[in-house]
């Protein structure tokens, strides 16, 4: 939902987009499925932000914080090995992505990567021209937007072996619920690892 929508030719942060449409509405076009037959759209959102390529990235981290998150999440290009740009989850951009994708459900991935943090930062709002906003601005304004960061208590334990919602630490569940409420879409799936069975269904 987040990175895919922002790289879409029509809905993304042009000119830092792909040459095609990356939103869910165009999936039937390439697969031969009638659009009206889509009953559910599952948006995939990382528990933090990552970015490939140039362009505005409001909540981007630099230095040691960025490197720690990059190392924890193995955030480097599959072919080039180039380090990806990373930062806390951007709820403003994610909410926009959910809206333009028409998502009816969300799969929140890589929750386990945040397990090393005492306090987990989230970009809850933007500040633009001295005003706080929850609306995703026009691309030309993004360079001037500043992140408004809030913090959620971390859980500080390995959750990669957890296989049910109730087994997750309370603070991990609270983080998921916080994101869910902020983006206005149910999070039905939570990924806690790279294994096939590391997907928790709520």
Give the residues covered by each predicted segment.
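Non-transmembrane, aqueous-exposed alpha-helical and coiled segments at domain scale
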Residues: 2-202
């Amino acid at each position: 939902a987040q990175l895919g929508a922002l790289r879409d030719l029509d809905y993304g942060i042009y000119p830092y987009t792909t040459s095609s449409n990356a939103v869910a509405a165009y999936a039937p076009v390439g697969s031969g499925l009638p659009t009206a037959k889509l009953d559910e759209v599952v948006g995939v959102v990382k528990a933090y932000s990552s970015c490939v390529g140039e362009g505005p990235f409001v909540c981007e981290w630099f230095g040691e914080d960025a490197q720690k998150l990059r190392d924890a999440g193995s955030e480097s290009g599959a072919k080039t090995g180039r380090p990806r740009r990373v930062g806390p989850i951007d709820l403003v951009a994610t909410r926009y992505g959910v809206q333009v994708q028409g998502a009816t459900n969300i799969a929140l991935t890589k929750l386990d990567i945040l397990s090393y943090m005492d306090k987990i930062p989230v970009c809850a709002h933007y500040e633009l021209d001295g005003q706080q906003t929850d609306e995703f601005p026009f691309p030309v304004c993004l360079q001037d937007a500043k992140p408004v960061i809030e913090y959620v208590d971390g859980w500080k334990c390995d959750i990669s072996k957890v296989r049910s919602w109730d087994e997750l630490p309370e603070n991990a569940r609270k983080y998921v619920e916080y994101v869910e409420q902020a983006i206005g879409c149910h999070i039905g799936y939570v990924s806690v690892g790279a294994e096939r069975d590391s997907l928790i269904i709520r």
